[in-house]
């Protein structure tokens, strides 16, 4: 009887706790449902050990990409994969060819399901993949893919039909020896209409000589032995390749100044006009060190201005474990802001753009200091409820699976944290009322944002460590308007990468960047998405092309994809 009464009390307390939480949560018309399995995304993404990560190479995971590879108007899906180490050994596990882990390409069937076309597309490859960036580097109309690895990076040229050729060597991008490629971005550094390529290198790592967990000062966390690094491991340098327009890339890392920025552990790289001068800059989130903002000097060289711009450290002046980047205009002032995700016991940085290349970290003032026990990875500033303000979603997952057995506060698997944008002033945590797609725990890394089903709202695809990917369908239930802008460059690169699109509707001004990489090691829908609230039309669409040209359209009807071709 006492047991039954105690059970009733526990049940009542649980109900009261749920009711109190639910009552306190703001009204939120968005529910995320993970439809990955129903959509055909059933293959687990292999990445390192299940219950223990012996070496840092097993921890970082990889990105995903939403990209229309076959030009049918529907987003296809690339999920990067790692592999495993042999038990007790310092080498990759052996697999039969048919069973070997591989990155996978899924073709959108346009009916809510995807077909695995990995082999047909020519991208089967086993290894420790990191990041993907996308763009039409040869301006032939097909989106090409660049994938970084621990080992050898790969450039896949799109044949135009969603199949690919590995052209790494003939493009001049084959590297000697083993390097750990991390973030990358296609970027037109010199306004010649050709996409150049920025590539970050995380650190120098030798599996044969790597220290065991607990074997040094940088091999424990909260007194518990864990895999070593990144602190204490040697750093590497970043690379910049100039597109020569003949199918090859030329290494200009030294003369451009990119390789001169040293002593960092760079991760995700996002390229856009962050300083507002019409030239494309590169922002790099760095792990455990100051982040980098490469300002384009307009002469083929770059200077790191992260410290003076306010984007190197957090609001307390500390370096953070920078993982992912979300770029967008959260306060609707027409300027591109930045969110940078971090490690447990920290909060995201929210770099509010003040104009003229200056930023301030407004994370605490904006209400982002409420979740700090999770390791944060892929992130996106996307208007999930189409009310005209960019919301925030980031995925979580610890790098030490063994920790949760000793420290319950730091679970290996965590939620997808969702913040509603409250009119550009503050963010409100709505994770608990965003559906099982948000609250079900996973150890996630990359996330890509885009309209997978072409219904006018933003969905999310997520890389999960040693699980199948998640496909979060946005079940927005309201009637707010929207518009999407697809670009085709003529003087600029054909894919429009690096452009900033500004939409004005009813006095509300919103900016979005067209990015080759963002989130965590991932690539989003190239179509710029804008919520319009109660409005059905936009007063003006302004495109700031990477060529420097500014183009405007007026009085445009909403609820559709508007294609804008650059004027010559």
Where are the predicted features?
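Gly/Ser/Thr/Pro-enriched helix-cap/hinge segments flanking short amphipathic alpha-helices
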Residues: 28-31, 39, 49, 366-367, ...
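Beta-propeller blade termini
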Residues: 60-71, 107, 128-143, 157, ...
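Hydrophobic beta-strand segments that make up the repeating blades of beta-propeller
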Residues: 74-81, 140-149, 197-201, 281-286, ...
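Asp-box/WD-like beta-propeller blade repeats and closely related beta-sheet repeat scaffolds
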Residues: 117-137, 142, 148-189, 199-231, ...
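Blade-edge beta-strand/turn elements of extracellular beta-propeller
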Residues: 32-35, 113-123, 163-174, 247-259, ...
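Short, conserved, GDST-rich strand-edge loop motifs in beta-rich repeat architectures
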Residues: 80-98, 201-233, 394-411
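Beta-propeller blade signature
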Residues: 102-108, 237-244, 295, 352, ...
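Repeat-based blade/solenoid architectures
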Residues: 41-63, 99, 121-133, 173-185, ...
């Amino acid at each position: 009887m006492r047991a039954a009464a105690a059970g009733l009390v526990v049940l009542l307390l649980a109900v009261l706790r749920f009711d109190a939480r639910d009552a306190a949560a703001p009204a939120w018309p968005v529910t995320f449902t993970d439809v990955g399995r129903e959509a055909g995304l059933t293959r687990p993404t292999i990445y390192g050990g299940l219950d223990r990560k012996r070496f840092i190479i097993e921890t970082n995971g990889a990105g995903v990409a939403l990209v229309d590879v076959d030009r049918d108007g529907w987003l296809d899906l690339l999920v990067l994969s790692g592999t495993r180490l042999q038990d007790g050994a310092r080498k990759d596990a052996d697999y039969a060819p048919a069973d070997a882990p591989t990155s996978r390409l899924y073709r959108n069937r346009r009916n809510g399901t995807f077909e695995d076309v990995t082999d047909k597309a020519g991208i089967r490859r086993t290894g420790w993949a990191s990041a993907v960036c996308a763009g039409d580097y040869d301006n032939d109309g097909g989106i090409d893919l660049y994938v970084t690895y621990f080992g050898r990076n790969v450039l896949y040229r799109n044949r135009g039909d969603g199949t690919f050729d590995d052209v790494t060597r003939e493009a001049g991008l084959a590297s000697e020896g083993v390097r750990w490629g991390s973030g990358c971005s296609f970027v037109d550094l010199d306004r010649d209409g050709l996409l150049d390529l920025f590539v970050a290198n995380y650190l120098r790592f030798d599996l044969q000589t790597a220290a065991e967990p607990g074997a040094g000062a940088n091999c424990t966390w909260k007194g518990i032995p864990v895999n070593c690094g990144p602190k204490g491991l040697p750093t590497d340098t970043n690379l910049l390749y100039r597109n020569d327009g003949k199918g090859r890339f030329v290494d200009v890392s030294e003369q451009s100044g990119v390789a001169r920025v040293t002593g960092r552990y760079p991760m995700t790289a996002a390229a856009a006009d962050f300083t507002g001068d019409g030239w494309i800059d590169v922002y790099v989130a760095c792990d455990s060190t100051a982040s980098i903002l490469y300002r384009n000097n307009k002469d083929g060289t770059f200077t790191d201005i992260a410290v003076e711009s306010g984007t190197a450290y957090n609001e307390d002046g500390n370096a953070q474990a920078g993982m992912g980047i979300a770029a967008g205009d959260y306060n609707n002032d027409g300027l591109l802001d930045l969110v940078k995700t971090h490690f447990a016991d920290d909060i995201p940085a929210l770099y509010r753009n003040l104009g003229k290349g200056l930023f301030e970290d407004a994370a605490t003032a904006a209400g982002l200091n409420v979740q700090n026990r999770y390791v944060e990875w892929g992130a996106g500033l996307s208007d999930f409820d189409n009310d005209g303000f960019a919301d925030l979603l980031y995925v979580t997952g610890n790098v030490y699976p063994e920790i949760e057995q000793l420290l319950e506060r730091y679970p290996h698997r965590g939620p997808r944290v969702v913040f509603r944008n409250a009119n550009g002033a503050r963010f409100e945590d709505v994770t608990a009322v965003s559906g099982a797609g948000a609250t079900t725990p996973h150890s996630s890394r990359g996330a890509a944002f885009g309209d997978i089903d072409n219904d006018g709202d933003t969905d999310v695809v997520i890389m999960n460590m040693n699980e199948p990917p998640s496909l979060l369908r946005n079940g927005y239930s309201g009637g707010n308007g929207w518009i999407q802008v697809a670009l085709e460059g003529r003087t600029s690169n054909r894919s429009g990468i690096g452009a900033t699109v500004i939409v004005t509707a009813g006095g509300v001004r919103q900016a979005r960047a067209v990015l080759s990489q963002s989130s965590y090691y991932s690539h989003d829908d190239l179509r710029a998405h804008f919520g319009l609230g109660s409005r059905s039309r936009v007063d003006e669409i302004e495109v700031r092309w990477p060529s420097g040209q500014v183009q405007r359209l007026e009085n445009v009807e909403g609820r559709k994809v508007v294609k804008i071709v650059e004027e010559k």
